[in-house]
């Protein structure tokens, strides 16, 4: 038995196919979703979506949003998403280093909040590059 997973951003469909299982980062922690999961709606945190397909794990960086699960259908609506395999490792590492520097030099509450969010997004992209084996 499988689940139908759709990952959507405001600009595109990132994923729309059947999967065996997912692990989703929510605001209250990670949750695993298998076929016949109880219906839920949850906020999606900045983090990694792990997808099991054909007994292999794939990763996707999600940048926060909302998910609805029910009747073996999972719809994830997020601000942005990138498949781990599509992320350039060198560019992601440079972005992470820049984000870390920006956190250190941020002044004022707003700058600190924005710098910390950018750092979380950069860390998530770097983490998505290395899928689970």
UniProtKB/Swiss-Prot annotation:
<dbReference type="GO" id="GO:0046933">
    <property type="term" value="F:proton-transporting ATP synthase activity, rotational mechanism"/>
</dbReference>
<dbReference type="InterPro" id="IPR020547">
    <property type="entry name" value="ATP_synth_F1_esu_C"/>
</dbReference>
<dbReference type="Pfam" id="PF00401">
    <property type="entry name" value="ATP-synt_DE"/>
</dbReference>
<keyword id="KW-0934">Plastid</keyword>
<comment type="function">
    <text>Produces ATP from ADP in the presence of a proton gradient across the membrane.</text>
</comment>
<comment type="subunit">
    <text>F-type ATPases have 2 components, CF(1) - the catalytic core - and CF(0) - the membrane proton channel. CF(1) has five subunits: alpha(3), beta(3), gamma(1), delta(1), epsilon(1). CF(0) has three main subunits: a, b and c.</text>
</comment>
<keyword id="KW-0472">Membrane</keyword>
<keyword id="KW-0813">Transport</keyword>
<keyword id="KW-0406">Ion transport</keyword>
<keyword id="KW-0375">Hydrogen ion transport</keyword>
<keyword id="KW-0793">Thylakoid</keyword>
<keyword id="KW-0139">CF(1)</keyword>
<dbReference type="InterPro" id="IPR001469">
    <property type="entry name" value="ATP_synth_F1_dsu/esu"/>
</dbReference>
<dbReference type="GO" id="GO:0009535">
    <property type="term" value="C:chloroplast thylakoid membrane"/>
</dbReference>
<protein>
    <recommendedName>
        <fullName>ATP synthase epsilon chain, chloroplastic</fullName>
    </recommendedName>
</protein>
<dbReference type="InterPro" id="IPR020546">
    <property type="entry name" value="ATP_synth_F1_dsu/esu_N"/>
</dbReference>
<keyword id="KW-0150">Chloroplast</keyword>
<dbReference type="Pfam" id="PF02823">
    <property type="entry name" value="ATP-synt_DE_N"/>
</dbReference>
<dbReference type="InterPro" id="IPR036771">
    <property type="entry name" value="ATPsynth_dsu/esu_N"/>
</dbReference>
<dbReference type="GO" id="GO:0045259">
    <property type="term" value="C:proton-transporting ATP synthase complex"/>
</dbReference>
<dbReference type="GO" id="GO:0005524">
    <property type="term" value="F:ATP binding"/>
</dbReference>
<comment type="similarity">
    <text>Belongs to the ATPase epsilon chain family.</text>
</comment>
<keyword id="KW-0066">ATP synthesis</keyword>
């Amino acid at each position: 038995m499988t689940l139908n997973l759709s990952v959507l951003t405001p600009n595109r469909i990132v994923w729309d196919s059947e999967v065996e299982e997912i692990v989703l980062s929510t605001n209250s922690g990670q949750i695993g979703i298998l076929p016949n999961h109880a219906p839920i709606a949850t906020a999606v945190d900045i983090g990694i979506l792990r997808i099991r397909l054909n007994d292999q794990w794939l990763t996707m960086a999600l940048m926060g949003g909302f998910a609805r699960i029910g009747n073996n259908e999972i719809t994830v609506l997020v601000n942005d998403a990138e498949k781990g395999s599509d992320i350039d490792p060198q560019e992601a590492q440079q972005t992470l280093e820049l984000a870390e520097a920006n956190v250190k030099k941020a002044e004022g509450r707003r700058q600190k909040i924005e710098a910390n969010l950018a750092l979380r997004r950069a860390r998530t992209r770097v983490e998505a590059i290395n899928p689970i084996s």
